[in-house]
Structures are given as C-alpha cells and as structure tokens.
Amino acid sequence: MIKIFNTLFLLLISNLLTLSNLKSQDNLESIIDQKKRIEFEIDFLNRNNYLSVSKDHIFLLRENESEKNLKWNIKLLDYNFKSINDTTISLDRSYFINKIDEYKGDFHLFFKRNYSNDKKYLIIKYSSQKGNIIYREMNFPLSLEVKKVLYFKNYFVFLSKANNSKNLISIYNIDNNQLNNIYEFMNYDKNVLKINKINSLNFDVIVSEENSNGLKVISRSIYDLNGNSRDKIRIENKDFSVIETRFLENKYAISILSNKRSRESVGVQYNKLDNNIAVSQKVHLFENLNSITTLTNYKKTKRSKFRIGELFYIDSLSIYDNKILFTIESLKSDDNNDGFSNYQYIPFYNTYSGTYDRKINPRFGGYLHNYFMILSFDYDGEIVRTHAKKIDQLQTFEKKIYIEYIFGNDYHLSSYVNKGKIFISKHFNKIAAEDKEYTYDIETFDNETTIKTETNPEGTYHLGNKVFITYGIQNVKKINNDRKRVFFINKIEIID
C-alpha cells in the first residue's frame, strides 16, 4: 500500500512539474512581433514569383501563362504592404528571367532569351517613382552566360562566362549603344570571382589565380567606365591558398584560407593595407579557435589533425563599436539524393506542357548550411571574440548565404527562415554567457492553418533596424476546410 501511494505521489509530482513547464513556456514573452502578412493566391496559370526590395519599396514580379506569351505582373508595395502600383507586361515565352537588381530605387529586370545561342538579352527598367517601363535589348558578339550586372547612370557593366569557361567583362554605353569589352581575362588562366560597384564612376574586379607554387592568390583591380584599370592589390600567403577576400575601406582585407589544391576552409587571414599594399598579416587557423573546435568535439593531440570538411563563404565585413566584424557561413552541395527532391527542379511548372521546364541534376538534394561564425577583430588583426554555431537542417535550393545579423553592444543576433520556421540566436559578448535560442512558426491569418511551407522559393530581407520581411510559398487550409496555395510575405520585427 505504501509502495502504491509513493508511486502515485511521484507520478502526481511529475505531472505537476510537466504542467508547470508547459505553462512557463506558454508564458514566455516572444522576442518577435509578426506585424503584417499579405498573400497572393497561386492559381493554375501562375508559374513563379520573384521578390526584391529597395529602401522604400517591395517589388513583386509574378510570372503567368498566357497562350503564346508570358504575362509578367509587377506589384509595387510599401513596407506596410500597401499597393503603390500594379502593372502587367507581355513577353515572348522564350524570355527567361535571370535576376532582379535595385539601383537608386528603380528595379532592373534582366532577361535572357533562350534559343538565341546565349547572345540576346533584355533589360527592363521599372521606375518606382514614375511607374514607367523602359525596354533595352542587347546582342552580345559571343555566346555568353551573364553572371553579374552592375548598373550606373549611363552604363551597364557585365561579368560573363564564355563557352570555354573564360571570363569577359563588358561595359555597355546606354547613350550610344556601344559595347566595350575587356578581353584581359579571356587570355589568361584567371578566374573572375566577382565585380563590385565602388562609386558612380568605378568598379572593382576580384580575380583568383595560381602563383608559381600552385597556391591560389586573390587580386583586386579598380576600373573606370572607359575600361582603364588602376590600383591593383594582391593578397597571398606562402603556406595556404587564399580562396576568397573581402576589402573594407581600402584599409583592411580579410580572407578565407585553404590548403593547397583544396577548397576546404582551414582558417582566416587578416591584412592591414596602406596605399594598396599589404603591410601586415595575421593568420588564425580554425584548429586554434575554441568556439569551432568545441562544436566539432576536436581534441588536439600530436597525432590528430583538425579538419572541419566545410567550404566557408564570406557573408559580411563591417565595423561596429571600434571592432571589425567578419561573418562567414558554410555551404556545400548535397549530390547524394536518392529519391525525388524539391531541389531537383527550377521551381516553375509549365501548365501547358504538363512538365517542369528545367530539370537540374536528379541527384541534387540542395545546398547544406552546416556552420556559421562571427569573428571580431581589433584593428591590429587580433581576434577579440568568436561565435561559432552548428546549423540544424538548413537546406536550400539556391546557393546563397542565408543568415542575417544584427550587431549590438551586449550581444549579436543571428536569424534565418527555413521551411516555415524562424530561427533566432542571441550570442552574448560576455565570455561565460551561453547563447539563447528561439524558434517560431511563420504566422498565417487567424482563419487559416498552414499545411506545408515549401522551400523553393524562399528568402529574407533585412529592411533596417530589427525589421525583416520573409517570403515563400505555403499550402494553407481555411476555416471552412477549403485549401489554397499562396505566395506570402510576412513582416517581422525583433522586439527584444
């Protein structure tokens, strides 16, 4: 009898503790406010939806079937989702949108014309203020895959890749329709990693090449809009390959390092610059950073060799509170998918043919994001603080950085949105303080229930301060049990 009583008493206490925990979790204050939501129903003829933002507006482009042509519906919204303008254009269905870029509040839509041997392109400029549209068709002399476009007042600058995998940079004069090609990178074993706009008159070209020892080095040259180069700077290391470099204020450069003939990241390099010359250098290997070795359970011995097995990409480089903050994120392709995956297809469906228009590698399972790091440096290149985190189950269709950051004096915030959930972490700047983790579902309207959130497309934009918008596609059930598929945009504010 006593044993039975004791057992019942323990069960009662256990249940009370469970109820108490649930209650305390329910009473926890949320650190986010999901302020607004807008939905656009996806019907039979809707193929795809694209989104971009400027400092004042949200730009939504919806692609719809229309017999022989495709109709592109442009919706311009303010940050409170109020409609500013609604326009529809019609294009031949051979046009495939490549990218949307914002320049001085206007949006540029860059289309490639399929079946044109990669020579014909179209740029449509949409003016946010006037609501008008300007079309500009271009014919390149070579078959090119355009990787990046920079927009200037009277010029376009293109970074392209030819069929032989060599790079070409082209400067297009809008006033006279003349194309000035920079052939330097077509003739040498150089890989142009990216081009960046510096100001209204100049852009830089970041190049990767091998030195005589077989190690990769990074160089940067500045070009004017006539194609003249100047101020070349070279970043290298005698023991490691320099895989990627980010420059800050022409005073600092921070790079990701790898071993020879490998892209797996092994550390970072800090260079101080003076008059386009690296005057100092400090190397910080991952095996010496406790924040990352702790995550991987690495124990240093004479025989053990640290290897994280990841490719890190630079996300941001900035100055906050007299410290240089450097953020990186790992990204690698999952090519071992054995069954059907959402990541096998470019995400639009041709309702007339009944098939997906474009299929990629059937074994492609998306891009895996496994780790990210925040590294804080002083101006001499010494590490002040590091935060490293293992990311759980972040898998994306697009090869792009996903983590957003907000830096603060007491702590830094990192966040990302994936598969219908919002993930936020607080990384405290005090050494002994542990990170805090928060997870929330993307909220729908009160009369709806989310059945599934798709991963393709999805994305997040930081609007400033602690306000974000996130977008994607959801399958929802209404209160009357009707189901629909919607493209949604949610506005989120971190209120902590």
Protein language model regions, located:
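Bacterial Sec-dependent N-terminal signal peptides
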Residues: 1-31
